[in-house]
Amino acid sequence: MERECGSKELFSKEELQEISGVHVGDDYVEVMCGCTSHRYGDAVARLKIFSDGELQITCQCTPACLEDKLTPAAFEKHSERETSRNWRNNVWVFIEGDKVPLSKTVLLRYYNKALKNSNVSKVIHRDEFVGCSTCGKERRFRLRSRGECRMHHDAIAEPNWKCCDYPYDKITCEEEEERGSRKVFRGCTRSPSCKGCTSCVCFGCKLCRFSDCNCQTCLDFTTNAKPI
């Protein structure tokens, strides 16, 4: 997904000055974060906040940990927090040396805005996977915007789709696919590990059907809906 690099300041210097580990990128702000398990202690990580509301966490719980691009809910589970499913309060950042839940910071501003907009539209698309025709490995596609939906739509329509066609990163068949424990997290707003419900499975809308596509699915939809 392409973002407008450096298009605006996500947070003011005053809002970030007391937060530990701040790094400001072209299209994101990154901070130190963590989640505490009463049994295993603190799992420390890096949280990236994007202007479109996306939150990505790279875990640093051990030097050998390779978990990255986790959702906060997935990171909460990975840290083996005993009382999970409340990542807004369980995932924290350091502010003036104290652990402060994300819910009590400004860092969820864009996430909450995106969530509010998605609830208004009532069109939620969970992440989907497309398998490589060569190696069989499955690659994740996010379906949050019309452009992302089109990339996924074109990928599943191509019988010879390969890892090298993946639109987000330059990858080959040598790259490992996501672990099964991560695949269950597909972006449902009701339940992080949802297997498919009426809130995250769409059977056709103006976001994921295209008037310039000649597949039967799009043709059936656009004959009964005004194209956008």
Swiss-Prot record:
Location in the cell reads: Cytoplasm; Nucleus
Does the keyword Transferase feature in the UniProt annotation? Answer: no
The organs and tissues expressing this protein are described as: Expressed in influorescence, pollen and siliques, with a higher expression in influorescence.
Q: Which Pfam families match?
A: SAND_ULT1 (PF23292), zf_ULT1 (PF23293)
The answer on whether this UniProt entry bears the keyword Transmembrane reads no
Q: Which positions are tagged coiled coil?
A: none
Keywords, ordered alphabetically: Cytoplasm, Developmental protein, DNA-binding, Nucleus, Transcription, Transcription regulation
Extract the GO molecular function terms from the UniProt entry: DNA binding
Cellular component GO terms, alphabetical? cytosol; nucleus
Q: Where is the SAND domain?
A: 14-121
The protein's job, in short, is: Putative transcription factor that acts as a key negative regulator of cell accumulation in shoot and floral meristems. Negatively regulates the size of the WUSCHEL (WUS)-expressing organizing center in inflorescence meristems. May act by down-regulating expression of WUS. Can compensate for mutant ULT1 protein when overexpressed.
Q: Please report the name of this protein according to its UniProt entry.
A: Protein ULTRAPETALA 2
Lineage, uppermost ranks: Eukaryota, Viridiplantae, Streptophyta, Embryophyta, Tracheophyta
The protein's gene is named ULT2
